[in-house]
Amino acid sequence: MSTPPTAAPIADSVRDISIAHSPDSDDAFMFYGLATNKIRVPGYRFSHTLSDIETLNRRAREEAFYDVTAISFHAYPYLQENYTLMGCGGSVGEGYGPMVVSSRPIAPADLGQMKVAVPGTLTTAYLALKIFNPEIKTETVAFDQIIPAILAGTYGAGLIIHEGQLTYSSSGLYKAIDLGAWWRETTGLVLPLGGNAIRRSLGSEPHRIISKALRDSIRHALDHREQALEYAMQFARDLDSRLANRFVSMYVNDRTLDYGADGREAVRKLLDLGHERGIIPIAPQVDFVD
């Protein structure tokens, strides 16, 4: 899909750009520079809205409301007419990722016999789970209520994302499968989980400028790690600074600055496979702007 050209901005005018992302510590870390005005762009003013990822997925699917929005890669085919992917700001699992956990030790094959709580049907975690085993029965539960629901015995197992990947064992739960590890073993690729999408209608020059601003924000956070982590800690649910640092390190790194050729290949592979398996009804047309 081509990006429409754009006229040069009028001198002294300020263009307002709305950005939406999740209140997760990794997202907060990468947007630290922009959110705190450490990164400024002449002629542009950025506003930030924080919302959980499933809400952002569904909002972007319904309308191109935000100029830039965090999304799960699974959601992209549903909004690709209005949005394109940014070449930076992604979170990928390097042999790790969302996990299915349970209150007792079980084998991955046992998941087909139980109902699994999932954080949303547009999350990439859900897509990976269905590629792994399309027969698994699921029910949507708010992501921060999945572990409590398993402990209460409401569900035999749950698909956990975000910080739950680091804290589940302290709740006495057991890992049935790490979908990031399974994906790496199956495809040899990283598991792309979430990225940032930008409205196509903004045009090529704003795409370039905003992409640079986000990349500069990520680089600033990586270069000023202590301050960025302190900022991100206010969004880190139930994590101490050590675990927050570990979680951010997992999902904000050089891959966040640029997916790399194999990272972009992984995005296409994941979505194409989802389409081939009948999980995604729309043929993906993946493109990136830098």
Model-predicted segments: where are they?
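A structural signal for short loop-to-beta-strand junctions that line the ligand-binding cleft
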Residues: 17-18, 82-91, 115
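Hydrophobic/proline-rich hinge and linker segments of small-molecule sensing/allosteric domains
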Residues: 85-108, 131, 184-201
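Long, low-complexity C-terminal extensions of enzymes
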Residues: 264-267, 272-290
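Secondary-structure end/capping motifs
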Residues: 203-273
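Beta->alpha turn/N-cap motifs
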Residues: 52-54, 60-77, 142-143, 160-166
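A local structural motif
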Residues: 39-50, 132-145, 280-286
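Bilobed "Venus flytrap"/periplasmic-binding protein-like clamshell domains
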Residues: 14-36, 98-156, 163, 265-268
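Pocket-lining segment of extracytoplasmic ligand-binding domains
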Residues: 144-234
